[in-house]
A protein has these predicted regions:
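Contiguous, amphipathic alpha-helical segments that mediate oligomerization or scaffolding
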Residues: 4-53
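Hydrophobic-cavity lipid-handling domains and compact docking modules
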Residues: 55-119
Length: 119
């Protein structure tokens, strides 16, 4: 019984770590794409109006922002890994029924703020 508990904990912890690392890789890739897009947009916009601000900033491993003058898109990777509740419709699929560990997921939130509200 004790071995079963240890095996389950090891498998679950390992899966959660894998999901965390994959989510972090995706967030790093997302930051690179956001920076490239912000730079391209800025180059085009500045030719027409130098007063329009378009900028990218990274706030570390978990947060990035793109500012479009009066609006800011904030991207935030949650540091926890979650699992779907058992009554969620995806848990009824063959894919998750075959392996319940497939119900774990990472979260990257995207928020849209008025830039003045972030000062």
């Amino acid at each position: 019984m004790e071995k079963d508990i240890i095996n389950i904990l090891n498998e679950k912890a390992s899966t959660k770590q894998d999901v965390y690392r994959k989510t972090q890789e995706i967030f790093i890739d997302l930051q690179k794409v956001l920076k490239q897009k912000a730079n391209r947009i800025f180059k085009e916009i500045k030719e027409k109006d130098k007063n329009i601000e378009v900028s990218f900033s990274s706030k570390g491993k978990f947060e990035a922002q793109i500012k479009f003058s009066g609006e800011t898109l904030l991207f935030h990777m949650h540091s926890n890994i979650f699992t779907l509740p058992n009554n969620h419709s995806l848990c009824k699929t063959k894919y998750i029924k075959e392996n319940p560990l497939r119900s774990f997921f990472g979260v990257i939130h995207v928020y849209n703020f008025l830039s003045d509200s972030l000062k």
